[in-house]
Each structure stands twice: as structure tokens, then as C-alpha cells.
Amino acid sequence: MILLKRTKIRGVSVSFVSLQRRTHSRLVNPIRQQHQQITKQRSSKILKNAHFYDFRSLPKVPTTQYLEARELTRDILYSGYRPVMYPVKENPLFRDKKRKSLQTLLTMNEKTNAEAKTIDEKKHKNILFGERGTGGIMSGGVNGTWKYNPTVPNELLPFNWWSTSSMGMEYFPEWKNVPPYMMRKLKPFDKALQMRLTHKSKKKMK
């Protein structure tokens, strides 16, 4: 609706055109209110995030966006995680009792104690390194590295798929004599594939 009002101000007649668009005013006012509310909410959220979620002190790490599932599963399988059983740490509550017992044994018979000590050392070595010095399920891991750092030795990488067990607890020294270029070409054993090859060879023979 357009209404024309004619008024006289100080003897001067001025025509004022007042545009009254009711539909427009009804729509504009709530939109402005909504916009103001949204801006207030956003500003409050920004302040909250800046106050509570400040990640600037955290170190930067490479992105995990382009990781492949196969590589992840392979790394998890060969990463060498296992339940830690050996070596068992000495309980400080029983140190004095052990020292007293050792002193009494030394006074009674030094020779027998020395022999027992050498046997204990051998057992300790077997526990850490295994009987052959190559680790094992009852040992501390690959060549005893589980005692200090739970990783496969560098000399066995990247061919540890063949030269070590799946959990990296035992390595097989006979694989050291195999050249790396031959190990690269190796593939896991597939019984079905071998059966197909034998079947084809039999057909050719016929």
C-alpha cells in the first residue's frame, strides 16, 4: 500500500510519500532478529572454542588421510606387540631376604654357590635370548631386544616377513645366507595354486 500524505509545516506544503509495505516489514524484522541471534551464537562459540580448545601447543603430526588399510593391517600384524612376561622385575620387598640367604650359602659352600650362579646365568641367557640365541616364545624376544626396545633388529628389516616369526619374537638365522633379491621375489605358499600347477603339468604329460 502506498499512502500519500499532504502536510503543512511552517506554511510550506510538503508532500511526503510514506511507503508502507506491510508484507515486507513483517518479513524483514524477524529475519533481522534471527540474523542477530545467529551472530551472537557464533561469537560466543568462537570465544568458547578459543578458550577451551586451543591446540596451538600440540605438536604437528603427518596427516592420516591417505593411509591404506593393507599397510595398516600389515604393520599391526608385524609390529611385535605381545603380552610382556619376561624379564620379571625384582620385588624390592624381598631383596633383604635374598641377600641374607645368599650370604649364608656363600659361607657354607662357595664352590657350590659359584656353580649355581653360572647355571642361573645360563638360564637367564636362555630366558632372554632363547636356547640358540635367536629368541623364541619362551624368551625375551628377538635376540633379547624386548628387554630394552620392543622392535625387530635393523639387520633383519625389511625382509623380516620371512626371517622372523609373525610377532617378531623369533628370527631364523638360516635366512641370513639368502640374497635379498631372491627374498623380494618370494611369495607366500598357496596349496591350491600348487595343486593347479601339478594338475596342469599332468595334463601336459598326457
From Swiss-Prot:
Localization, UniProt: Mitochondrion envelope
Principal location: mitochondrion
UniProt GO BP: protein catabolic process
Entry keyword annotation includes Transit peptide: yes
Organelle transit peptide residues: 1-24
Keywords assigned by UniProt, alphabetized: Mitochondrion, Transit peptide
Name the UniProt record assigns to this protein: Protein SUE1, mitochondrial
Species: Saccharomyces cerevisiae (strain ATCC 204508 / S288c) (Baker's yeast)
Lineage: Eukaryota, Fungi, Dikarya, Ascomycota, Saccharomycotina
